[in-house]
Regions:
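Core domains of carbohydrate- and sulfate-ester-processing enzymes
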Residues: 77-123, 188-193
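C-terminal segment of classical bacterial N-terminal signal peptides
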Residues: 29-36
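Bacterial N-terminal signal peptides that target proteins for export
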Residues: 13-22
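Sec-dependent N-terminal signal peptides
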Residues: 21-29
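Accessory beta-strand-rich segments of carbohydrate-active enzymes
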Residues: 83-86, 116-193
């Protein structure tokens, strides 16, 4: 009969095709996710020291930069950060894909940073997440930088908290108003040299 549709049954062949498409899609998604999951690894530089061989990326210069005044509650954010090359004056986006890892506080030109890259375009985005300890909640939280060469624009959870220009001087921002009540906080820093 013309104009009539076949019964709403799905053949075994159609089910097999759907399963195959789902399997391929999952493999592709896994591959994309794995490609974005970059691990930090120290590069081999022209002059490596014994100190660099024993460096613990989970505890980099743990006592530095320590606030000048003694405080019980503070966090050291040295360690592995996400990194991506930026274009000059690029606006922040939560959708950025960070394709490298860098060991902070080392400059990206150094082997120990894990990047060892020189570029005419010295604009980068640094990113990491952190969780504010219970003991610090409800208090003003200051984010200190020992130095950023040359310009830094700092975002916390997508909100711009400040801009600093000048390569060799310490600075800080009060980030309290940009923090979420609970959970992970995102810290993103645009750096232009």
């Amino acid at each position: 009969m013309r104009g009539e549709h076949a019964p709403a049954s799905i053949s075994k062949m159609t089910i097999m095709k759907i399963k195959h498409m789902i399997a391929v899609s999952l493999l592709l998604l896994t591959g994309i996710r794995t490609a974005n999951a970059v691990e930090w690894q120290m590069k081999q530089g022209p002059m490596m020291t014994p100190w660099s061989e024993t460096l613990d990326p989970e505890n980099v210069l743990g006592e530095y930069p320590r606030p000048q005044m003694e405080r019980q509650e503070w966090m050291n954010l040295n360690g592995i950060w996400d990194l991506r090359k930026a274009i000059q004056d690029e606006a922040y986006s939560p959708d950025f894909i960070y394709d490298k890892k860098i060991l902070v506080p080392f400059p990206l030109e150094s082997a120990i940073s894990g990047v060892m890259e020189e570029s005419d375009n010295q604009c980068y985005w640094y990113r990491r997440t952190l969780t504010i300890p219970e003991s610090m909640k409800g208090k003003n939280i200051l984010l200190h930088f020992d130095a950023v060469d040359w310009e830094a624009i700092v975002y916390v959870n997508g909100k711009k908290v400040g801009k600093h220009t000048g390569g060799y001087d310490p600075f800080y921002f009060d980030i309290t108003s940009a923090l979420k009540q609970d959970g992970e906080q995102e810290l993103a820093v645009y750096v232009r040299d």
